[in-house]
Amino acid sequence: MNPHDTIPIVPAPRHDAMPDVRALVAYLEQDPQPMIVVDPDYRILAANDAYRRQFGVAGVEHVGRHCFQVSHHYDVPCDQAGEHCPMKQALESRGLNRVLHIHHTPRGPEHVDVELRPIFDADGNVIAYVERLTTVRSASAQPSAEGLVGGADAFNAALGALQRVAPSMLPVLLLGESGTGKELFARALHEASDRAMGPFVVVDCSGIAETLFESELFGYEKGAFTGANQRKPGLVETAQGGTLFLDEIGDVPLPMQVKLLRLIESGTFRRVGGVEALRADFRLVAATHKPLREMIDDGRFRQDLYYRINAFPIPLPALRERRGDVALLAESILRRIANARASAGDAGARPFVLTERALVCLDAYAWPGNIRELRNVLERACLFADDGTIRIEHLPAELVVASAVRQEGAGDARGVSDAELVRIARTFDGTRKALAEQVGMSERTLYRRMKALGLGTREV
């Protein structure tokens, strides 16, 4: 079944109309993707085998339960818990709605792309909804030794945009401060696209001298200049059939911006010293931390090039905007450090761990250098943590002082730290009410705290 096919009208799948539900499920079984049928009261009426295999739990029957209980462990619908509810939006628009959520699964929390479509009766009334669920492989909501990692609302917004644009050929412009993970996002975009089997070629626009830029990008013919003893393909040619990632495109010299624009507009290029126009075949992804619009006003960046690369901009959040993600990222980075040590021949390499005080300190810091700064801090701390435990004294003194100032400024005597609440919420298997009782606060206070942390209350 194609995701854009119109779902045929069927009799209302009431709880007492099992033959109709079974007929709909038989239709859904043709789809290899996990799918469920949900009634207007959020109750799961049926699920296909693909859903049971991927999201089912042995001994637990999902049919008959509310979808928000199964997927989120909520005791209220998503929109009442501070989340975007695709069912509510689909009812208002009377059409397909799509959203990226974090669902509880047998493997732990996972990013899931939810596509929901209403089913109408002969009178035009919505009688049920069909949900198609696709696990997002390009990012992890759990600690991971590779790839994108995150669970905060700001991160999920960027990931959701990435998932939507990945199947297309639109040029993508990643916008964000230094250290926010632009290359990781670009690579994830490539791997989620139809060109995933092709090359992913990175062009560091800030690291190539202006005099070498053209030959590096387009290559050169034998004899094109002194020292050109043989033909050399450029990075554009190397990216054939794949993705060309222009990192820090704001650093491209003005004379080269003209040639880059011609490449994008015509889809052709010439090697330096060559006369033959060669056909380019790549998906363009660019990134910058610079204010390109201001650079256009100052005459430092071409407006026509800007509109070519800015077809689908994706703002990437700074780490300080990803409340609740510091602990997740820290554990992921520590795993990567351990893996690197093991690969280097350290047979006893194992993941380092952070004390609660150290984690609270990291969580309170503003991280002007973003994830890159967090990685540097942890790599340094690992060199001092002889027993594998990173304590607050292993962190840079200026970071500890800055964190203390921020914590004092918050005037917060809440008992449970943000870092501790994030950790508990992400491992808690129960309702929000039960979690509130465990951490000793009201459910309303818990909701407000989790919302401020960027969790959107979805972790329970």
Name the predicted role of every residue range.
Residues V57, R195-G198, G273-R283, P291-S403, ...:
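Nucleotide-binding/hydrolysis machinery
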Residues H15-F55, P167:
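Sensory modules in modular signal-transduction proteins
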Residues A161-G227, E237-P253, A318-G324, V377:
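Conserved post-Walker A coupling segment in P-loop NTPases
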Residues M1-P19, A47, R52-F55, H104, ...:
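Bacterial C-terminal helix-turn-helix
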Residues H101, V114-L116:
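Compact sensory input modules in signal-transduction proteins
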Residues A158, T180, V203, L217, ...:
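Conserved RecA-like P-loop NTPase ATPase core
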Residues P118-N156:
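Sensory coupling linkers of modular signal transduction proteins
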Residues V60, R65-G108:
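Terminal output helix/cap of sensory domains in signal transduction proteins
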